[in-house]
Amino acid sequence: MVVQNNFLFIAFIFVTFMMLDAWQSESYDYKSLDKNHIIEKKNIENKNINKEVFSRENYITVITDLFILKINTYGGDIEEASLRTYLSNTKNNLPLKILDRSKNFIYKLKSGFITKNDHDINNLIHIPNFISDKKLYILEDNSDYLQVPLFYNGENGLKYVKNFIFKKNSFSLKINYSIKNTNKDKMEMMFFGQLEQSIKDQEINNGYNFNFHTYRGAAYSSDNNKYKKYDFSEISNDKNLNVITSNGWIAMLQQYFIVAWIPKIENKYKFYTKNIPKDEKVSIGFQSELFSIDQEEEKNIESTLWIGPKLQDKMYEVDANLGLTVDYGWLWFIAQPLLQLLKFIYKYINNWGISIIIITFMVRGIMFPLTKAQYTSMAKMRILQPKIIEIKNKFSNDKKRQSKEMMSLYKKQKVNPLGGCMPLIIQMPIFLALYYMLSGSVELRHAHFVLWINDLSSKDPYYILPIIMGITMFLIQKISPSSISDPVQKKIVSFMPLIFTIFFLWFPSGLVLYYIISNLVTIIQQYIIYKDLKKVGILI
């Protein structure tokens, strides 16, 4: 009775939600990126570091507990960055590469100084060629910090040091400039920082999951917007960003990972985007106001860079608004507490799958009074069905009288006609918040559960969990009394377990696990509720 009607209601709500989410997510579709660009937590020993990282003459290599980086001395920018504690996939021990400059894909940083005559940052004539004391920098086990200084002496009398500062156990790093003017004339310049990424024939999120809630694109935070997405499609169509702000950051995002640049803004900065059609790239960057450096004057410019997973608590420590990039949609106020609860359980269980099972029991237990009210109301409505049909037939030509008589019947029998669906409507935000939370949390990426489930964030490779979920839905349907008389509706309802099974084949394993446990709880709760209803004579 209850479940048959609920199947249709849930299907409608769920499909509507998915369509709305697809429209709101602003995700931009790109094809086929090597999955090395989709990024979990396992230590990779130094012996697994590819020796190729030492081979190129104009690159220096930086190795910390979390990073393997390549910095090009020509320009002094990070052009490749791999995360040592996150794997490219579950089949190898290779660290995930975030920043890259391969033949088919470019995702890199660029920063430096320009004059008022430099109109195009992407076609600079004068690019500094830095020198470094070493080709290899390693953050030792007994050190908390590592500094990588690069030096440049320009022909125009400009000298500066570009210093990368890494901190142990941190995905954020400092990029600090110390500039000195040894020229006899005052110099005027602007500081800029930029993120660039290829957009053609790439697949960072596509095909990884059947997951509409995935966003790949640019974003920024400014005086007027704490967090604003800026889609790659807008940039590639030359709908460029031009924002003046006194604080904030720029970033490029994918499902679980982010590269964000936070300049220390003393006055005003311009945030901008740029389409680079020649290289099939887009960029987002920041640029300072024009400033001057007198003869023998020295100026320091600081910025912070985050390269890594969307770890909300850690990102909030770097910038108050950076944690907003962990996007749990419009139900964030429910999803975030649920994630904190999941993390709390994981601390003691050390298995994300079991943690999901426990939180499912907890959530369904808390909602049990609502579930019982829903089943009770629907059972009462079923008892009233003969009288409702009688009223409908008696006053078929007088809808106003029909409605009045039915409301009188409900009042007399103390039945709320909305009592069956209202508890379900109240529960839906919690279920949808769990969807957001389970599909958007990097903690579940490559998280092992049991046996063949090595990644709770991706689909079940053998589709066993979706099939089990379909079986549980079939069992719920079979043990539930039915009041559906319409043969068409009855046929549709009978196919719902199969439809949902197919629908869930590509869902993240963690989410399917949640629905399996939730369905098992439903079976248990149905037995308890129906037993109580039979005792009081409501259910026959």
UniProtKB/Swiss-Prot annotation:
Segments passing through the bilayer: 1-21, 351-371, 418-438, 464-484, 497-517
GO cellular component: plasma membrane
InterPro entries assigned: Membr_insert_YidC, Membr_insert_YidC_N, YidC/ALB3/OXA1/COX18, YidC/Oxa/ALB_C, YidC_ALB_C, YidC_periplasmic_sf
Keywords tagged on the record: Cell membrane, Chaperone, Membrane, Protein transport, Transmembrane, Transmembrane helix, Transport
Xref: Pfam families: 60KD_IMP (PF02096), YidC_periplas (PF14849)
Membrane topology term: Multi-pass membrane protein
Gene3D superfamilies noted in UniProt: 2.70.98.90
GO molecular function: membrane insertase activity
Cellular compartment(s): Cell membrane
Any Gene Ontology biological process: protein transport
UniProt entry tagged with the keyword Transport: yes
Superkingdom field: Bacteria
PANTHER family with a match to the protein in the record: CYTOCHROME C OXIDASE ASSEMBLY PROTEIN COX18, MITOCHONDRIAL, OXA1
Assembly description: Interacts with the Sec translocase complex via SecD. Specifically interacts with transmembrane segments of nascent integral membrane proteins during membrane integration.
UniProt cross-references to NCBIfam families, sorted A to Z: PRK01318.1-3, yidC_nterm, yidC_oxa1_cterm
Function: Required for the insertion and/or proper folding and/or complex formation of integral membrane proteins into the membrane. Involved in integration of membrane proteins that insert both dependently and independently of the Sec translocase complex, as well as at least some lipoproteins. Aids folding of multispanning membrane proteins.
Family under the similarity heading: Belongs to the OXA1/ALB3/YidC family. Type 1 subfamily.
Record protein name field: Membrane protein insertase YidC
Organism: Wigglesworthia glossinidia brevipalpis
